[in-house]
Amino acid sequence: MKFTRKLLDFYLKSSLHVALALTAMGFISLRELTSNNHYVLLPQLFFLGIVAYNFVKYIPFILKNNKSFSKKLKIIILTSCFLSCYLLFYFTSAPVKEKQILSLTILLTLAYTFPILPYKNSLRQLIGIKTVSVALCWTLISLILPIIHTEISLNLNVYAAITQRFLLVFVLILPFDIQDIKESESGNIPKKIGILNTKRLGTFILTLYTFLFYFRTFPSSIWYWANLSIVLLTAILLWLTPAKSKHQLHSTFLVESIPIVYGLWIFFFSN
């Protein structure tokens, strides 16, 4: 039991779970918008998720602490460095448009992590900007990058899909903001408008997400049911999010599992 707990802890802290969620989002995008198998892009999304989240979580800590690091952290750092080298090679060989998307994502990640002028604060301190920037990064990597990679023509359906992806990720971030309300920066949404209003905001955004179905064209009816189920599951977890969680299993594992559940549903039940 102790070994299992340590393994789960490493799985979460090394960002494997959130990277898997990002990859699942990318898989959903490719499966929905293209009839060809372009899944070669998925490993890049997975590695990018690991590197980006470990960068955000651990680089500020490393810069502030000169003490020796734990064996677990050393493994995470070394793995992230190795994957960074691979991603650098991928970046140099990527087409120009893909480089532009990746560059924008990198800039947003840096602005989110480090102070930016003239505010001398990171994006975390600006109200709501943290949530918007993370949702935008997810949308860029999990949807817009696959769209460019597969050369999908832009139309109303694609624009609606992009908007939906942004809205869904935005709401998925809110449980993290709620649980981090005491330790988070001044830009935290629940800290500004309250936990109850944050949950109401999330519900309203999910309503907008559902309304956008009117502009969508899915490969089959299973996609509608999958989307509606994910909306319902997201709403339930949002409203059940406690202001304080001892182990943070709710946000770290359950909420990040929603894209994975979504991807598995599509993998097994869609044509």
Mark where each language-model region is.
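Helix-coil boundary and interhelical linker segments in multi-pass alpha-helical membrane proteins
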Residues: 21-44, 87-100, 140-163, 212-225, ...
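Extended hydrophobic alpha-helices typical of membrane-associated regions
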Residues: 68-72, 228-271
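Central hydrophobic cores of alpha-helical transmembrane segments in multi-pass inner-membrane proteins
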Residues: 23-26, 45-59, 85-86, 106-114, ...
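Intramembrane alpha-helical segments
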Residues: 72-149, 238
